[in-house]
Amino acid sequence: QNTKTNTFNLNFFLNETCKDAMNIDDFIDSIQITIDDLKNLAKNGYVEGMSYLLIKNLKQLDVTKRPLHCSDLKRESIYIRDKNLWNKGDDKNTRLAKIATNITRLNTIALQGEYQNRYPHCLTDTKSKEHDEYGKIAYEAFGGKIHIDKANKKLFHNIMKYVIIDRNTIVYIIHSLLYIQS
């Protein structure tokens, strides 16, 4: 009975309370990568840089508008809003890997656009600080020294820690909504 109640509460939370949540593709499209984000990636590496970037952008959204919610950190159960539906992620985190790939693409575009525009000598002056930094950003954007699958596993865990749904919070929100409606 308790499992059914928890499942019901989770489904109610996702499908009713979070019915206006942003779709994951819209969330990714809304991310504006800054030069500071790129420098953070170079300084702190792929896992920390990407975690910071995603969490920074998730923080800008109300909890009920976020496109990601984790229901069980130990089992890495994540729900992703896609095409106005909540879908549970698979065991291989295929959808999260696609998200990471899209963010890597955005980092590359920002590196080749904003960074090169601000520091046009970064490709030609091999002795400049910006040339070195450009190389570090490009290296870290694709996972750095850690194998990309291992790096993504750490990245996903960091994101899941941030979007974990506390069962007490779900119950509180649901009861608040029911109280308001009555």
Would you name each region that the model predicts?
Residues 2-179:
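Extended amphipathic coiled-coil helices
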